[in-house]
Curated annotation (Swiss-Prot):
InterPro entries: Glyco_hydro_5 (IPR001547), Glycoside_hydrolase_SF (IPR017853), Glycosyl_hydrolase_5 (IPR050386). It comes from Neosartorya fischeri (strain ATCC 1020 / DSM 3700 / CBS 544.65 / FGSC A1164 / JCM 1740 / NRRL 181 / WB 181) (Aspergillus fischerianus). This is Probable glucan endo-1,6-beta-glucosidase B. It holds the Pfam family Cellulase. Belongs to the glycosyl hydrolase 5 (cellulase A) family. It comes from the Eukaryota. GO terms for biological process: cell wall organization; glucan catabolic process. Glycans are attached at residues 30, 272. Residues 1-17 form the signal peptide. SUPFAM superfamilies: (Trans)glycosidases (SSF51445). GO terms for cellular component: cell surface; extracellular region. Beta-glucanases participate in the metabolism of beta-glucan, the main structural component of the cell wall. Acts on lutean, pustulan and 1,6-oligo-beta-D-glucosides.
Length: 400
């Protein structure tokens, strides 16, 4: 994560965990160390729609796959049939995020990728009589992580789509489920089996050598009273099962994975509530002012971001954020992306300033087909809104 982590007293218990520059160096095949700068923070992008397709991000690609009009991967596979869907998704996996994309990320000063995946990547967990997901994704995940490791990128793998869906009516779960069916023991068990399997793959396959963090579920329901079983049962068992898998492989404790959960600020309760040991824990916060009820003015957005203190649990990475603003104003003249680049440059800098008070940030997302750089890091760089020298942001002095 950061080279100075061991020096931070609040995080001293994490000093022997598997983090870049603490106990293990990350270098590219040509010897480049992306964590060797004086900053050393996580600076990354999400690979949205690579292995868990969200149609709103890339409608053209979705339509080209034959999935147009379908709400989720589950729906598309149901519509196309398994064999045809497998071919369509394989073509997508091989072209959406490429080795050239990863090289471009590195050239922009990024050092981390977060890779959303679904539990169905472990295919024997899928109920063949009632669940419909694409098959064959593991090979493409291996290739991607191998390229990223060669490039010197740190990798977080995130269980983005949980069994039964951790939130209703949202394609980021891989299905458009009417209710959140995840919060019951048999679904937890399927997720735990996925985590064990993923942990074993990470430690036994050299292509996964730069994977240092495994997130146990993305964006659970934001109602602590409804997800008590997740905190009391799933989180403790995730720790136990991941550690048991590592111990069975005789993994040195310095090479253990960080186990990541959404932090308390997310709204699903305190993730540490039932944990007896948080020695290797990490936390994720998602900060979208678009939906945060902040007064809709440019000054308010800048001041809110500059004053953000996202430290309810430590170490926290702000694992999703963007430059998008409320739907009601996003195309108004005062907020339109093409005519307000100066504001978006400053707001980007303000958010980076806040999130680097913690362990760093991961923008949502790397690429999109929206014609709107506020959701696409790649497009924002091309538009001149995000600099290729991220250290130059300090010179803007947006937050004083």
């Amino acid at each position: 994560m950061i080279r100075r982590l061991a020096a931070l007293s609040a995080l001293s218990g994490l000093a022997t965990a598997w983090l870049p520059e603490v106990n293990k160096k990350i270098t590219s095949t040509n010897g480049t160390n992306l964590f060797s700068s004086s900053n050393g923070k996580i600076r990354g992008v999400n690979l949205g729609s690579q292995f868990v397709f969200e149609p709103w991000i890339a409608e053209k690609a979705w339509s080209d796959m034959g999935c147009g009009g379908q709400k989720s991967e589950f729906d598309c596979v149901s519509s196309l049939g398994q064999a045809k869907a497998n071919g369509a998704f394989a073509s997508h996996w091989g072209s959406w995020i490429t080795q050239d994309d990863l090289a471009e990320m590195v050239s922009y000063g990024l050092n981390t990728i977060r890779v959303p995946v679904g539990y169905w990547m472990r295919e024997d967990l899928v109920y063949s009589d009632s669940e419909h997901f694409p098959q064959g994704g593991l090979q493409y995940l291996e290739n991607l992580c191998g390229w990223a490791s060669d490039a010197g990128l740190y990798i977080i793998i995130d269980l983005h789509g949980a069994p039964g869906a951790q939130t209703p009516q949202n394609p980021f779960t891989g299905q458009y489920a009417p209710t959140a069916g995840f919060y019951q023991d048999y679904q937890f068990e399927r997720a735990l089996k996925f985590l064990e399997w993923m942990t074993t793959n990470i430690h036994q396959n050299d292509k996964f050598r730069n994977v240092g963090m495994l997130e146990v579920v993305n964006e659970p329901v934001q109602d602590a009273g409804k997800v008590g079983s997740m905190r009391s049962t799933y989180y403790p068992n995730a720790f136990k099962r991941i550690r048991a898998a590592e111990q069975s492989l005789n993994i040195d404790r310095n090479n253990y994975l960080h186990i990541q959960m959404m932090d308390r600020l997310w709204g699903s309760g305190d993730p540490n509530e039932s944990l007896t040991d948080t020695y290797y824990a990490a936390y994720d916060d998602h900060r979208y002012l678009k939906w945060a009820g902040v007064a809709v003015s440019k000054d308010s957005y800048i001041s809110t971001s500059c004053s953000d203190q996202l430290n309810s649990n430590t170490p926290t990475i702000v694992g999703e954020w963007s430059l998008s603003v409320p739907d009601s104003v996003q195309w108004n003249s005062d907020w339109a992306p093409d005519s307000n680049k100066d504001f978006y440059k400053k707001w980007f800098a303000a958010q980076v300033t806040a999130y680097e008070k913690q362990q760093g940030w991961i923008f949502w997302t790397w690429k999109a087909q929206l014609g709107d750089y506020r959701w696409s890091y790649q497009d924002a760089v091309a538009a001149g809104v995000i600099p290729t020298d991220l250290n130059s942001l300090a010179g803007l002095k947006v937050c004083g």
